[in-house]
Amino acid sequence: MEIREFADMDKFEDIMNNWAKATGLATVAVGADGKYISGCYNFTDFCIKLTRGSKEGCRRCEKCDREGKGVYHCHAGLIDFGIDLVVEGQKVGSVIGGQVLPEHPDEEKFRKVARELGINEDKYIEALKKVNVRTEESINASAMLLGQVLNNFINAEYSKKINGSIIGSLTDGVNAANHLVEEIKKKTGELRSIQSKQKILAL
């Protein structure tokens, strides 16, 4: 089951975009296979251009994307989150994001990360200074809110599609029954006509 098969993705992405603007956090949705199914909202240069721009950094980021649950510290020292998207007990994807700091950073710690990833230290620190700072409590509340809203939305979309299919099937059934009734009436009329002719001939 894929979200794009039953959900209005324009509305889905509107929710994500508005949430990202309101909270200052980054977010993206992935399918059950881990591949992106939405745009990337509010992504920082620190993450998308520098950390993910290095081979080792990208490998570590993808590992966090796959394995991160709830609110957690990513390999580069930022706070990220991963919330499952579930329909009828089946995981159909995840919404991931964050890319914020829980406190003002220790530059030396991040210079060490830059060296490990083969990234220019000064550029890394310059990008780091543009990363938003949020308390873990507010990050957790924001992540849970997005997860709840998206889960409610996709479940409503799924129910609408399923109910629409049921109604469509019932309508088809009613139409078929009406057609059958009309055919029976027609055949009955033809039979009565034949019977009348037979009576006349019998006279």
Where are the model-predicted features located?
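Structured interaction and signal-relay segments at domain junctions
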Residues: M1-G77
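Exposed alpha-helical structural elements
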Residues: K11, R59-R60, K109, K123, ...
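Sensory/regulatory domains in signal-transduction proteins
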Residues: E62-R115, K130-L145, V149-F153
